[in-house]
Amino acid sequence: MNYHQYYPIDVVNGPGTRCTLFVSGCVHQCKGCYNQSTWSLSSGHRYTQEMEDKIIADLKDTRIKRRGLSLSGGDPMHPANLSAVLQLVQRVKTECPDKDIWLWTGYTLAELDDSQQALLPYIDVLVDGKFIQEQADPGLEWRGSANQVIHRFTL
């Protein structure tokens, strides 16, 4: 997996202060997407064990308390990203059980296949659906267009 950007301190992509990872790779390529540079699977940087360790360390950092981890992109549910994302969310839930995990995907909940659904037990909030420019609304909380749905599994 590649990632496009990592923000160890983020107050925009989810509630509270968070760590946010923007992965590379998206098949949806939505018209009007603000993250078009993440569409290619090869864009950005190689995701490594060192990066995963850094995310865990940042989540555990008591100097700057983070509420949780946000995963966006690109698309964390892209088939090429699933193995690395699953490993990361499992590790977060094991080593940082007090942290929540938010994940944004262009797939709807109904469209997820079995391998994508394997992530759901580790996700607290899923924001699903493609960005549809004609339904864009900057006043929406945590989503870009009115068709997108916020699924709160544990929060």
Curated annotation (Swiss-Prot):
Lineage: Bacteria, Pseudomonadati, Pseudomonadota, Gammaproteobacteria, Vibrionales
SUPFAM superfamilies: Radical SAM enzymes (SSF102114)
Cofactor(s) needed: [4Fe-4S] cluster
Keywords: 4Fe-4S, Cytoplasm, Iron, Iron-sulfur, Metal-binding, Oxidoreductase, S-adenosyl-L-methionine
Compartments where located: Cytoplasm
Subunit note: Forms a tetramer composed of two NrdD and two NrdG subunits.
Natural source organism: Vibrio cholerae serotype O1 (strain ATCC 39315 / El Tor Inaba N16961)
Cofactor comment: Binds 1 [4Fe-4S] cluster. The cluster is coordinated with 3 cysteines and an exchangeable S-adenosyl-L-methionine.
Similarity comment text for this entry: Belongs to the organic radical-activating enzymes family.
EC number: 1.97.1.-
Residues holding S-adenosyl-L-methionine: G32, C33, Y34, G74
Pfam family, one: Fer4_12
Domain of life: Bacteria
Full protein name: Anaerobic ribonucleoside-triphosphate reductase-activating protein
GO molecular function: 4 iron, 4 sulfur cluster binding; [formate-C-acetyltransferase]-activating enzyme activity; metal ion binding
Role played: Activation of anaerobic ribonucleoside-triphosphate reductase under anaerobic conditions by generation of an organic free radical, using S-adenosylmethionine and reduced flavodoxin as cosubstrates to produce 5'-deoxy-adenosine.
Substrates-to-products reaction catalysed: glycyl-[protein] + reduced [flavodoxin] + S-adenosyl-L-methionine = glycin-2-yl radical-[protein] + semiquinone [flavodoxin] + 5'-deoxyadenosine + L-methionine + H(+)
Binding of [4Fe-4S] cluster, residues: C26, C30, C33
First-level EC class: oxidoreductase
CDD domains xref list: Radical_SAM
